[in-house]
C-alpha cells in the first residue's frame, strides 16, 4: 500500500508539513518496502487552488491514503472524490507519522480540519 505524507523535506526524517495544499513536499511511501518517492509540491507557489492542485497530484501517484497535519475543504473534497482516505493530526517526522498511522493512532477524518486558505495564513516565514 502506498501513502502520501506532507513534508518539509525530501526524506523520512523531515518534519511533517502541517499544511496539505502548500506542503513543501509530498512523500509517497510504499508501506511494505518503505521506498520513498519525494515530490516537490508545485502547489506551494500557486496563487489559488493549491489544495485541489495538490490533491490531483497525490491522486495520480496511486497513493491510497494521505497523512497530514491539516486539510482544508477544497483539498478534502478533492481527495475524497478520488477515493483517498485522509488522516489529519500527523506530527513529528514523516517516519514518526507513518509509525503512528501503522499503530492506528491517526484516525481517518470525515471532514476538513481547517477552513479555506489555512495554508496561506500559516506560510512559514
Which residues fall in each region the model found?
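Non-catalytic interface/targeting segments
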Residues: 1-53, 60-61, 80-125
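Amphipathic, hydrophobic secondary-structure cores in small proteins
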Residues: 65-85
Amino acid at each position: 500500500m502506498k501513502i502520501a505524507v506532507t513534508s518539509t523535506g525530501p526524506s523520512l526524517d523531515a518534519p511533517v508539513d502541517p499544511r496539505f495544499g502548500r506542503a513543501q513536499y509530498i512523500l509517497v511511501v510504499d508501506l511494505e518496502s518503505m521506498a520513498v518517492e519525494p515530490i516537490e509540491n508545485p502547489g506551494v507557489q500557486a496563487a489559488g487552488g493549491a489544495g485541489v492542485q495538490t490533491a490531483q497530484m497525490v491522486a495520480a501517484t496511486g497513493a491510497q491514503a494521505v497523512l497530514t497535519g491539516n486539510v482544508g475543504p477544497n483539498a478534502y473534497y478533492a481527495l475524497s472524490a478520488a477515493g483517498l482516505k485522509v488522516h489529519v493530526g500527523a506530527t513529528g517526522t514523516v517516519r514518526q507519522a507513518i509509525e503512528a498511522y501503522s499503530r492506528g493512532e491517526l484516525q481517518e477524518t470525515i471532514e476538513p480540519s481547517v477552513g479555506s486558505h489555512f495554508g496561506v495564513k500559516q506560510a512559514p516565514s
